[in-house]
């Protein structure tokens, strides 16, 4: 029997430390991190760290040995090594003062692509759509950052371009389903091929970038996510018969920028335009065509009129056909044509034209209104645009964020921006009188609910329902009393007879009543103890892991209930203070 060597099986074999992985791949730590981000490999936590680290208890980062073996065959790894040698040659040339050779080296520097990694990690398109939440969050974050020494202007410009392409597609296809304005920014949710995609767009405020952020890792993620989104957008645009990348109207981009500057053309129109350009005749060919046409006309005039069929056909062409009108008054047989849009939210504002005030953020509202089928006129853009072609008589709603408006136009509905958000979340048009300028707005709640399960609107409805049930039960009990008066009288007669019999025997009726109440209490206690015993038995039958999970679940549920109760108490206090204030205002 051979003696088994130590640290050759189990955790010691399955796991590799980070320093061992870097040594095995022969790359720097920074390149190793980049490679792991590109390939989606992350650190693992072994069950027994001491065994995995071969007896050492020093804090280390572990990876699967198979993952590191998988990285050894990556083509990007060779590109990293080539870049390392290129950097050495470049520093040597610059140190010697050989500028021409340094320029040649810089021109021939190696570059790599992440296309094959995207195809490996996302074999199907739905897999890629499910994973673009983080990609969108990262790109919108960098699009909002100012250009610094760590983040160049090209990076922010490219990120902004990809974000606008995404928003332009979502707005054109009308895919937005939910929106929530929070302290961090605006959360959007869109339905892309049956998958719910949620992302965060920060507010366009001046950013103070902290100094303790490692931008190298963030830029690596940005590089991967931008490649992923290019793939996704190309697929979405081509499937919708649109040209990718979309063209930008330079004149509008200088004035307004945003979604209105993007021109989304279909590929069929593009092909027709290119075909017409290619088939434009030259001067010589046009002369030949005119000569041949003249000869053909002369030949037609000299032809003998001997064919009667031609005459008939000519007469048939000039005859006007009778118009048949549908006299059927019953329109029930006509089938309603299905809409090209799946959700009713897509056509929510299709009949409206919105005039957005200069104090309202146009980028948020323009995206939402266009996604719901509406039209937008921005007051901020009118200063730079010619207002001759704009028809202001078609404006149905004006969005303002001011407490008082001096001049109002007749025929327009004046609303605050929250009306757009609440209509979209509820998938219907809510009453506009609650959102008039200067009015106290209803609470803007998250459409995805609270983590603790608290919903103020639902709780109010439930409380009202409980009150109604109590009233119904009281009414029902009153009716039952009226119906069963005779039965109650019979019961009273029986009780009186029992009392007389017991008094004759020398026993008090009150003592018997007390014993009946005690027996009922005992039965209740017995039932509760039985239920507790059943719970204890179930707990005994559980494994240690299940028991711990059950205790954690009970603790979390108790915390949630406590939080909900506190919120309800706060709500009651706020409603009481509001009632007091209204009473005081009424007295004044």
UniProtKB/Swiss-Prot annotation:
An MF annotation (GO) of this entry: large ribosomal subunit rRNA binding
Superkingdom of this protein's organism: Eukaryota
Ranges annotated as biased composition (Basic and acidic residues): 510-519, 576-588
Any one Gene Ontology cellular component term annotated for this protein: PeBoW complex
CDD domains in the record: BRCT_pescadillo_like
Annotated spans, Disordered: 446-533, 559-588
Disulphides: none
Matches recorded under SMART domains: BRCT (SM00292)
Predominant location: nucleus
Biological process per Gene Ontology, one example term: maturation of SSU-rRNA from tricistronic rRNA transcript (SSU-rRNA, 5.8S rRNA, LSU-rRNA)
Compositionally skewed regions (Acidic residues) per UniProt: 460-493
Protein's name in the database: Pescadillo homolog
Organism: Vanderwaltozyma polyspora (strain ATCC 22028 / DSM 70294 / BCRC 21397 / CBS 2163 / NBRC 10782 / NRRL Y-8283 / UCD 57-17)
